[in-house]
Amino acid sequence: MTNIRKTHPLMKIVNNAFIDLPAPSNISSWWNFGSLLGICLILQILTGLFLAMHYTSDTMTAFSSVTHICRDVNYGWIIRYMHANGASMFFICLFMHVGRGLYYGSYTFLETWNIGVILLFTVMATAFVGYVLPWGQMSFWGATVITNLLSAIPYIGTNLVEWIWGGFSVDKATLTRFFAFHFILPFIIAALAMVHLLFLHETGSNNPTGIPSDADKIPFHPYYTIKDILGILLLILFLMLLVLFAPDLLGDPDNYTPANPLNTPPHIKPEWYFLFAYAILRSIPNKLGGVLALVSSILILILMPLLHTSKQRSMMFRPFSQCLFWILVADLLTLTWIGGQPVEYPFIIIGQLASVLYFLIILVLMPITSTIENNLLKW
């Protein structure tokens, strides 16, 4: 008799995705981040659900309701900090996952890659609207500044901003709709993640060499299930270390002050995971130019398959491209640091140089370097 997991309509899907899936025998720990992102999403949906049971999306009571969750609700404080720091872990895993894709040439799976980029935008949108909900100073002013950027769009900009706000400023209507968006988007992310996996399983996973691994496959279970469990345990360890020992390490102290439209904080800045894009935005003195650069900094990922000029898929055997990749990583860390600094000398010029270097590496230096490497190998 055939095993039920191979015949039952529902279990068959799970079996083909997580049990009998043929996987390359040599994928490293960089391939763990997909499963970690799945765990992060489940964790965020669960903690978010319990927070939503006690949260009120009204300007008068939002800040108080978050305080109430932390002080009066049983284990409310741990749920709240797991949700806030879970977002940080989510983005750490996301950046690692995207970095892995860039390094090993996984972007040649076009559908999987493009859905991944859409997922990245969706997660960023979710995190942004979520940051507004506690209705602290940085929530309010972050929402005001970032939504205001849409006014740079010619002709329809101002109308678009007022339409999103639901009035002439960030107010009750804005908070209510942002809560609605924040509730629905994670489920859209979950659906997109399933499509992402669907397309990945059409081609099978890439591997560190970038060479097709059809000749050497192993079953996903038990080899990679046990490997994923190790990754999940480490993820939970780091998350709980953050939650229990330094819950406010990655937050902004200004967000412990209730939102006040009459008092602007001295330094408006987003959460750490948006700082690199914020630095690129600020490095251009023109409003529309800054917005275009901001969007391009993420949208540029869609161009990666077009910019791939190497005859090899992975960077594993391409030392010059490896150097450029790690310079790009250092550049992104520099941009993250600059995004959190005040707009003054020398930070302005450092930010501008780092922004130029970011686009220069991706659009110009990487394709040229790949071509040089091809020639050196007489290809």
From Swiss-Prot:
Protein name as catalogued: Cytochrome b
Annotated positions binding heme b b562: 83, 182
Binding site for heme b b566: 97, 196
Subunit composition and interactions: The cytochrome bc1 complex contains 11 subunits: 3 respiratory subunits (MT-CYB, CYC1 and UQCRFS1), 2 core proteins (UQCRC1 and UQCRC2) and 6 low-molecular weight proteins (UQCRH/QCR6, UQCRB/QCR7, UQCRQ/QCR8, UQCR10/QCR9, UQCR11/QCR10 and a cleavage product of UQCRFS1). This cytochrome bc1 complex then forms a dimer.
Keywords: Electron transport, Extinct organism protein, Heme, Iron, Membrane, Metal-binding, Mitochondrion, Mitochondrion inner membrane, Respiratory chain, Transmembrane, Transmembrane helix, Transport, Ubiquinone
Keyword Electron transport among record annotations: yes
Subcellular location: Mitochondrion inner membrane
One Pfam family from the record: Cytochrome_B
Name of the gene encoding the protein in the UniProt record: MT-CYB
The species this protein was found in: Megaloceros giganteus
